[in-house]
Amino acid sequence: MKKKKNKVKEYLPLYLMMLPGLLYLLINNYLPMTGIILAFKKLNFSKGILASPWAGLDNFKFLFSSKDAWIITRNTLLYNIAFILVNMVVGIAIAILICEVKNKKMKKIYQSAILLPFLMSMVILSYIVYALLSAENGLVNNTILPLLHIDPIQWYQKPKYWPAILIIANCWKGVGYGCLIYIASLIGIDPTYYEAARLDGATKWQEITKITLPCLVPTIITLLLLSIGRIFYSDFGLFYQVPMNSGVLFPTTNVIDTYVYRALIEQGNISMSSAAGVYQSLVGFVIVMLSNWIVRRVDKDRALF
């Protein structure tokens, strides 16, 4: 008993440091899970959640029988796959380039510059995109396209351009966070590997492909698995605010998160919104478990669990 008490006293500061994080997870992640019950009920506001009649799987049937089910699932999945791949490739490339900078002050400036967009709100990003793509005063229509002898484009009325626009906007905003993690991993690589490679006459490209990338594999796999865990979740602001909620663009910008919001705000259908959220969570859970199982089969040490 004395040993246990001593251990509690010894680790008490660490337990207290954990407490805010645990409370945050409990309040924001676990307590909302009780709302899953709404997906199986026909909510009646006068009766409340518990007294409302059960609907079984009717909300899910309505969701999957609607024409939007396939569109929002396809958009959510394909966009997130593109985001993961593009951000990973660009993040690794920028991290390698920054690590090649010898001047420490310049290296810090570049690191700060690449992280700055990540700290911006999506509202600011939406107005930056609007300043570029506005039909009347946008930089692209008024400056860039005339130089290329191309007629102005009504960007907010042309769905075909928006997959590329959203991928570029997401990469510009989000690549900095992953880039810093890759930089931290690159700093941890033993410099003697590179010295030995140079003595053997290796080129810079060979150093990257034979030393840098293999040493980054554990970090890449960890970030990849964490990203896959949220592959069915989208940045609401990116798909709602950046396209300015343009109805013409819904076929290419409507994802599960925006669909849930519109179903809740415009239709007032909380039960169907909850069903879409449950569907989103279950598919994401299955995908991350499957991905972790595959990694575990290949290399146990690199799996999350």
Predicted regions and their residues:
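N-terminal Lys/Arg-rich, disordered targeting/topogenic segments
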Residues: 1-2
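A structural signal for multi-pass alpha-helical bundles of membrane permease subunits
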Residues: 6-305
